[in-house]
Amino acid sequence: MGTKRRSLFTIVFCILVPLGANAQSGPHPPCESASPFPDFAPPGHVPNYRVWSKNEGVLPACTGWSARAGMLVAIAGQFRYSGTADDLLLGVGAISTLRGIRYWSATENGWRTLITSATALEGPDLHRPRADFRLSEMTSGAKLYFTQTDNRLGEPVIYLMRASDTGGNLVITIGNVSPVKKLMLTLIEPGDLQSIHYLSEARPGMWRYYGLARTEEPPLAAFGVVRTESYVNRALALYSHLTGAAIEPIR
């Protein structure tokens, strides 16, 4: 699996999909002692996902997030991968490979580009683009900045990312440091769009992924009128990019 299929950053924004809440009190990520919820989907299957709307989901204390209300999304799956944790980290740092990811738009009944631009940054400054992050940077725990532009927004957003590797268990945290805007209107303030991504090797050749994302307010207005299936397909496209698994979109 090449690095192009392993970056996962846009999950922080694009998996915030209105798929309906559930009766559980909230997600259980791998950082908790309880069994993960949602549980990991089998390899080759669509990842399990759950969405909690305002005031429904309880934020896990182990995330370190504040208990502000908003939308909370969890996604969990397994994928086959013969590389190492370092290989995955290199893929995560390959920000430029996010550009051009495509998804099936149920609203427009056709394939569309999901991310129109993406690049690593020297700091929280759009005027300081740089090459993709090196492995030494990914394993240092340093603050790493990148920017990406969603096809529905058209304006770049700057994110801060930090990664850690504990015995092959990867944890990547991401949050926006610039506001999310459209047509000069601020939709989400800095720090109100956060995600944590957990990757661990279940057994040789088999990895688990658990992603958790929250936003102070759902960003649905940013995209205008879009069918629910299109949001789901965005998440599926990003998961396919990460894992290399061919997952059929919802049509």
Give the location of each predicted region.
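A conserved amphipathic terminal alpha-helix motif
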Residues: 223-251
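Hydrophobic ligand-binding cavity/cleft-lining segments
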Residues: 26-152
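Bacterial N-terminal signal peptides
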Residues: 10-18
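A short acidic/glycine-rich loop-to-helix N-cap element
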Residues: 183-188, 215-234
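Hydrophobic/aromatic beta-strand elements that line small-molecule binding cavities or substrate pockets
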Residues: 158-165, 194-201
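Bacterial N-terminal signal peptides that target proteins for export
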Residues: 1-9
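A short, solvent-exposed beta-edge/loop patch
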Residues: 195-226
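Sec/Tat signal peptide C-region and signal peptidase I cleavage site
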Residues: 19-23
